[in-house]
Amino acid sequence: MQTIPIKHVGNDPLVDAFQRRYYYLRLSITDVCNFRCNYCLPNGYQPESNKPSFLTLNEIRLVVKSFANMGTEKVRITGGEPTLRKDFLPIVETIAQNPTIKQIALTTNGYRMAKDVAAWKEAGITSINVSIDSLDARMFHRITGIDKFEDVMRGLERAFEVGYQKIKVNSVLMRDLNDADFNQFLTWIKDKPIQMRFIELMQTGEMDHFFQQHHVSGQLLADKLINAGWTLQSKGLLDGPAKVFKHPDYVGEVGLIMPYEKNFCASCNRLRVSAKGKLHLCLFGEEGITLRDLLQSDDQQLQLQARISSALQGKREHHFLHQGDSGVRANLASIGG
């Protein structure tokens, strides 16, 4: 279990040594996922014996409280598949009770969306990202290991019906699998308020061969968009890592997440807490800094905030993916991608 000494960090608790400010917390609430995506957990979720349990509702309240006290305004709930937790709605409601948190986003595989999305909205979810890696049901099944394409698409329709104005759809484009779907996705969003986000396949410890076989450069997609008349938009304070493109003839937008791009880390504004209570300064890199011993009481808030602030001073300027170094991350499910 890694801890760090607490040191004085000045008056800006969520500013790192490179003057990047962190307004955005990605909070994983479970490692469990019921899909078996070939780029993430191809063998499905494998529970580990004798490992710590996932954060409790009260621990989640306390960690969000500390981050909010330090300036965080957006929380994204991730997993695994976060909606598999039986207390998912109470978790959302608890986060929503914090007046500093302006946005509560959810990343989901969409498995429960058709049935539950109205309840998610009522509980406080302000925006949804749903993973749809292909618009072809057979390819969707091949990539995810689950024959639920129609259910997910019904869930997407239902999300619009209950009042979400725009949905973000995530797709990991992979050579010789779904890269040919790129143009089909663009046609699909022409008259739909969807931000179609293409995520560049990332190398992890367990997936080196898969990466070498299927990686598609995000820059190739960016060049295609620009040549077709799409224009790059400026980023907002609470936006994620995607480069967003718009076209005058399209209702939808395109987002590109390109971690191998030069200066990808320059605008980083997010920190991660794993489902077992570790602070991760980067998706790729360190093993995490334990917070859980300071998530037992409201009386520990100042200690917790000091630990987070001090840890942030050790955040690196950038990852080393471009050098083939994916850090210690075996897969992306454990800290929510």
UniProtKB/Swiss-Prot annotation:
Domain Radical SAM core: 17-242
GO BP, sorted A to Z: Mo-molybdopterin cofactor biosynthetic process
Keyword Kinase recorded: no
Binding positions for [4Fe-4S] cluster 2 per the UniProt entry: C265, C268, C282
Positions that bind [4Fe-4S] cluster 1: C33, C37, C40
Pfam short name (any one): Radical_SAM
Biological or metabolic pathway of the protein: Cofactor biosynthesis; molybdopterin biosynthesis
Cofactor(s) required for function per UniProt: [4Fe-4S] cluster
Summary of the function given for this chain in its UniProt record: Catalyzes the cyclization of GTP to (8S)-3',8-cyclo-7,8-dihydroguanosine 5'-triphosphate.
Name of the protein described by the UniProt record: GTP 3',8-cyclase
Organism encoding this protein: Pasteurella multocida (strain Pm70)
The gene coding this protein: moaA
